[in-house]
Amino acid sequence: MNQIIDHIAVIGGGAWGTALAQTSRRAGRRVTLWAREPEVARAINATHENPDFLPGVSLDPGLHATADLAEALRGAEAVLVVCPAQALRPVLTTARPLWPGRAPMVICAKGVEQGSGARMSEVATAVLPEAPLAVLSGPTFAREVAEGRPTAVTLACADGALAEALVLALGTRTFRPYASTDVVGAEIGGAVKNVLAIACGVVEGLGLGDNARAALLTRGLAEITRLGRALGARSETLSGLSGLGDLILTATSMQSRNFSLGFALGQGRTLDQVLGERRSVAEGVHTASAVVALAARWAIEMPICAAIHGVLSGDYDVTSAIESLLSRPLRVEGGSESQIHPTAKTATP
């Protein structure tokens, strides 16, 4: 029999945290949302709207928000952690003494930690080893989830029974989690696609055409697959919702923070200019260097991610980055992807 999860805490009052709190209320759960900014919590409670991060979306009146982390966690039977990837370690360190017993943690952040190269589940296990762990990932825009538009995601947990219990707790008619036991696969797809989305945005901003973007998406999926398989992920996860599905969504829409950032770079704007106009985080900016370092550690070729890391770090301009990709040797597709060497021509008599 699956355990029953009724009381959910959501750590993170941004767009995605608010959307997950809203869909959890639709699933009939008691929900407390923690927002770092007291004014965000006050606005949600007073107006049933998050005007800073999800303006115009009406929230369930039963959704309670607080800026007091202890209050948010008290009595929770599951905790959704919805903070930027690079903030996960400090957020969990603060939450650790307040954690509600052995309540499972569902990580909803997508990225790789800078410096350590750790996946989000590895960070969580290091800080809170006693908390059962799951990962929620997939093709999602926060506003559409909050508005109740049809969405499907992967919910991965090494404990299959817990994965199913969380699916039952969070699932609704329009929010469809699919249970998986492949945590690594769910994480790698969700992290790397943010870097690839920046690349696709650059291609769009430069006006290189649909052919180029399709090629970049396909070769980007090959990079996700190479890294994921090296780390132990299953191929079907990488070609599923949290891999290919998330890549298609994030790398083809201006709703994506990462795609729109890449588009602006392709149009000639600087990274500082683009980031200076934003309040929300484009995770690919921080994940690029960590993914490239992780790939180097495992001797995995990821030329698209490396090119975008070069752009973000100031080593290349966008035109040079694209040129570096186009000048790579021709290869066999699939398998070992061995390089094709030209055969020297011999003169005919």
Swiss-Prot record:
Keywords: Cytoplasm, Lipid biosynthesis, Lipid metabolism, NAD, NADP, Nucleotide-binding, Oxidoreductase, Phospholipid biosynthesis, Phospholipid metabolism. InterPro entries: 6-PGluconate_DH-like_C_sf, 6PGD_dom2, G3P_DH_NAD-dep, G3P_DH_NAD-dep_C, G3P_DH_NAD-dep_N, NAD(P)-bd_dom_sf. GO terms for molecular function: glycerol-3-phosphate dehydrogenase [NAD(P)+] activity; NAD binding. It catalyses: sn-glycerol 3-phosphate + NAD(+) = dihydroxyacetone phosphate + NADH + H(+); sn-glycerol 3-phosphate + NADP(+) = dihydroxyacetone phosphate + NADPH + H(+). Sn-glycerol 3-phosphate binds at residues 110, 138, 140, 193, 246, 256-258. PROSITE patterns: NAD_G3PDH. The active site is at residue 193. Its EC number is 1.1.1.94. SUPFAM superfamilies: 6-phosphogluconate dehydrogenase C-terminal domain-like, NAD(P)-binding Rossmann-fold domains. It holds the Pfam family NAD_Gly3P_dh_C. Pathway: Membrane lipid metabolism; glycerophospholipid metabolism. It is an enzyme of class 1 (oxidoreductase). GO terms for biological process: carbohydrate metabolic process; glycerol-3-phosphate biosynthetic process; glycerol-3-phosphate catabolic process; glycerophospholipid metabolic process; phospholipid biosynthetic process. NADPH binds at residues 16, 36, 110, 142, 257, 281, 283. It is found in: Cytoplasm. GO terms for cellular component: cytosol. NCBIfam families: PRK00094.1-2, PRK00094.1-4. Catalyzes the reduction of the glycolytic intermediate dihydroxyacetone phosphate (DHAP) to sn-glycerol 3-phosphate (G3P), the key precursor for phospholipid synthesis. HAMAP family: NAD_Glyc3P_dehydrog. Belongs to the NAD-dependent glycerol-3-phosphate dehydrogenase family. This is Glycerol-3-phosphate dehydrogenase [NAD(P)+]. It comes from Rhodospirillum rubrum (strain ATCC 11170 / ATH 1.1.1 / DSM 467 / LMG 4362 / NCIMB 8255 / S1). The lineage of its organism: Bacteria, Pseudomonadati, Pseudomonadota, Alphaproteobacteria, Rhodospirillales.
